[in-house]
Regions:
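Glycine-/small-residue-enriched transmembrane alpha-helix faces in small-molecule transporters
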Residues: 1-36, 84, 88, 92-95, ...
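Juxtamembrane helix-entry segments on the extracytoplasmic side of multipass membrane proteins
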Residues: 3-8, 30-39, 68-75, 132, ...
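Helix-helix packing/entry segments at the starts of transmembrane helices
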Residues: 15, 38-40, 105-111, 174-195, ...
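Hydrophobic/small/kink-forming positions within alpha-helical transmembrane segments
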Residues: 19, 23, 83, 87, ...
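Specific transmembrane alpha-helical segments of multi-pass solute transporters/efflux pumps
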Residues: 21-22, 53-109, 144, 224-242
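C-terminal-most transmembrane helix of multi-pass membrane proteins
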Residues: 42, 50-51, 57-58, 216-218, ...
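Transmembrane alpha-helical segments that form core, pore/gating elements
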Residues: 45-49, 116-117, 152-206, 234
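Hydrophobic transmembrane alpha-helices of multi-pass small-molecule transport proteins
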Residues: 49, 127-147, 167, 198, ...
């Protein structure tokens, strides 16, 4: 099999796994609270990446592996900051899922893809006209998807929008530090930090018990092991042989799979108006990722 074809298949599987994870998160919270879900799933995700790091080191595939104590300190510090941002974003997403559907959550969360180049303007990066048009289209699509009669918006949709904004800053920070870091180690640290912060919220605001956690072991294991460890590993391997623009397009299908699995697995369908909103948002997401055409001279 051609390397790029294999990479595309891995990235498509990655998007499918992440899309189904929205269902796992939603179903898991029928038994445990958002903080408990976060603490358990991200702890498992961190554990799964430990052997992945070991294998990558043995194969010589690790990139920017920390060689000195200073490198390790910088890696831990960057991972901690990523973990705080990930905790804030996923906590809003978890609470949002209590008051919105899986499909809506998937598409609204995916707005970070449109937001990232806009935030880049703050750091001196230019955003072309197409990016702003895509942002406007995404806002209109979100209006069709989330705004009901009487201009009412579900609280869960607003929380998920906040999640998308936080994921935007999370991605921008990773983009700034990742060229100097080992990506898998960075992710492993952020998972454990996110789990620790979620555990604090779990013990302060919730009343976790092993019976409830055991009752939703499958959603927790799926969200932690598959969405965290397996999908992330697929992403790392797949992106090696696929052009960045194509990789982003494939992974943005996560929102489509979230809506599809929400409908198939738990019967959360979307109305015609909401489907049109999804289509507009997805088109905006795709167009925002296409490379800018270079002008001659």
């Amino acid at each position: 099999m051609h390397k790029q074809t294999k990479g595309c298949i891995l990235l498509l599987l990655c998007a499918m796994i992440w899309g189904a994870a929205f269902v796992a998160q939603s179903e898991g919270m029928q038994y445990v609270g958002p903080f408990t879900m976060g603490a358990t799933r991200f702890f498992l995700a961190g554990l799964v990446l430990l052997p992945v790091i070991r294998v990558l080191d043995r194969k010589g595939w690790s990139q920017n592996r920390p060689a000195t104590k200073e490198d390790k300190k910088r890696q831990l510090a960057a991972g901690a900051i990523c973990g705080v941002l990930l905790f804030a974003a996923t906590t809003l997403q978890q609470f949002g899922l209590l008051d919105t559907t899986v499909g809506k959550s998937g598409f609204v969360t995916a707005l970070y893809i449109v937001f990232v180049p806009i935030v880049g303007v703050l750091t001196g990066k230019k955003a072309g006209l197409r990016v702003w048009l895509c942002a406007a289209a995404a806002v209109f699509g979100m209006y069709l998807l989330c705004v009901g009669s009487g201009f009412s918006v579900a609280g869960g949709d607003l929380l998920t929008l906040g999640c998308a904004v936080l994921f935007t800053f999370h991605i921008c920070y990773i983009s700034a530090v990742s060229p100097r870091m080992d990506g898998v180690r960075l992710s492993c640290v952020q998972f454990f930090v996110c789990s620790a912060l979620s555990a604090i919220g779990m013990f302060v605001f919730e009343s976790p018990d092993w019976a409830s956690i055991r009752s939703c072991w499958l959603p927790i294991v799926y969200a932690g092991v598959f969405s965290g460890g397996v999908a992330y590993t697929f992403q790392i391997i797949g992106e090696r042989d696929v052009q960045p623009a194509l990789a982003s397009l494939l992974m943005s299908l996560e929102s489509v799979f979230a809506a599809l699995f929400g409908w198939i697995l738990i019967g959360q369908g979307l109305s015609g108006r909401e489907l049109i909103g999804c289509a507009i948002m997805f088109a905006a997401i795709l167009l925002s990722q296409l490379p800018e055409r270079k002008t001659a001279g």
